[in-house]
């Protein structure tokens, strides 16, 4: 497990564990979400992410350990909607209730002014859909309405569980811009995902879990630095070139099994110059770019590795005869959102 200490925590998990009968969902999980960060909570499906988020929010009682939100247990916060906005599932919207009425109901429940409902519709770009029933909304529109609900209390923290699921690229881009703008206002985001590439462009920190345990936490900058591009060099005397490079301060050098050396932190021109000075002939050089998604998969590999010849797991298999592909979900366009803390976004509504 690799752990890097960071700034003060908006959210802190301390030894969280959860046992569901014979299933150990989370085991001794500890991590922090720094204040003002966008932290990606990453892991394969079934790795304990949703259970952990629900424990943080007091929706599931942990078997062991505890957690803190802004320094205190969540259940002790007097006005939780003003501290934490939660986006767990957009399927809980009443299909016969309009977007505006939905927000008014929740505004009344948490004790904020009725006018806040219209403001939040404007914030997420749903003003023109205020009088439409939620049951007619596309997945992207439902997700925006769920975010508007979470924002009613003007929270300091947003917690989102797999918010990109089912969204098309335009919807994902809108969500990314929205969360970046929220964090730029000095607030904190914890967003879960089973794919690093979905959140890589917006997160500043990552917490990676597998089988309900921590495998990595730290900043994205540190993760990128640890897996930066390398120059793979084939030459007449690898050992001599490595020694010459080390003398110039280039120490990220690895001897590969095929006789080449992998060099980090030096550009081709520098390596060529050092090789010439050391009287080493370079036969070829190629830059190896590291795919962070592959790094993430390596961290979490093995969680669901299938046994050879195992076929379908019990209860799973081909659908019975007569079941076709699911129908396409209609995507209704809406006007572009306007987000006051960083200005209008480019492009249209969700899909």
Where would I find each of the regions flagged by the language model?
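Short Pro/Gly-enriched coil loops immediately N-terminal to beta-strands
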Residues: 81, 227-228
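Structural motif detector for alpha-helix initiation sites
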Residues: 35, 99, 220, 289-292
């Amino acid at each position: 497990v690799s752990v890097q200490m960071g700034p003060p925590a908006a959210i802190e998990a301390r030894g969280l564990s959860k046992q569901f009968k014979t299933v150990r969902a989370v085991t001794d999980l500890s991590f922090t979400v720094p204040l003002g960060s966008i932290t990606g909570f990453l892991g394969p499906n079934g790795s304990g992410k949703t259970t952990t988020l629900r424990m943080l929010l007091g929706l599931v009682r942990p078997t062991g350990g505890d957690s803190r939100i802004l320094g205190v247990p969540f259940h002790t916060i007097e006005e939780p909607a003003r501290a934490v906005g939660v986006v767990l599932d957009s399927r809980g919207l009443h299909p016969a209730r309009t977007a505006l009425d939905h927000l008014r109901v929740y505004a009344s429940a948490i004790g904020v002014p009725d006018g806040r409902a219209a403001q939040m519709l404007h914030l997420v770009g749903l003003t023109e859909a205020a009088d439409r029933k939620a049951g007619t909304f596309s997945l992207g529109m439902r997700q925006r309405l769920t975010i508007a609900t979470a924002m009613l209390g003007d929270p300091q923290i947003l917690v989102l569980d797999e918010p990109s699921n089912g969204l098309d690229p335009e919807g994902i881009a809108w969500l990314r811009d929205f969360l970046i703008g929220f964090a730029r206002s000095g607030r904190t985001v914890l967003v879960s995902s089973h794919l690093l590439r979905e959140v890589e462009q917006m997160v500043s920190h990552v917490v990676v879990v597998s089988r309900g345990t921590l495998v990595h936490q730290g900043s994205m900058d540190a993760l990128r630095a640890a897996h930066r591009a390398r120059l793979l060099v084939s030459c007449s005397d690898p050992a001599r070139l490595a020694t010459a490079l080390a003398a110039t301060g280039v120490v990220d050098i690895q001897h590969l099994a095929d006789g080449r050396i992998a060099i980090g932190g030096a550009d081709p021109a520098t390596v060529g110059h050092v090789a010439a000075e050391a009287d080493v002939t370079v036969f070829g050089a190629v830059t190896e770019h590291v795919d962070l998604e592959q790094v993430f998969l390596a961290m979490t590999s093995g969680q669901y590795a299938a046994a050879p010849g195992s076929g379908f797991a019990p209860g799973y298999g081909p659908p019975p005869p007569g079941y076709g592909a699911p129908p396409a979900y209609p995507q209704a366009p809406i006007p572009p959102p306007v987000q006051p803390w960083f200005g209008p976004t480019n492009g249209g509504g969700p899909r």
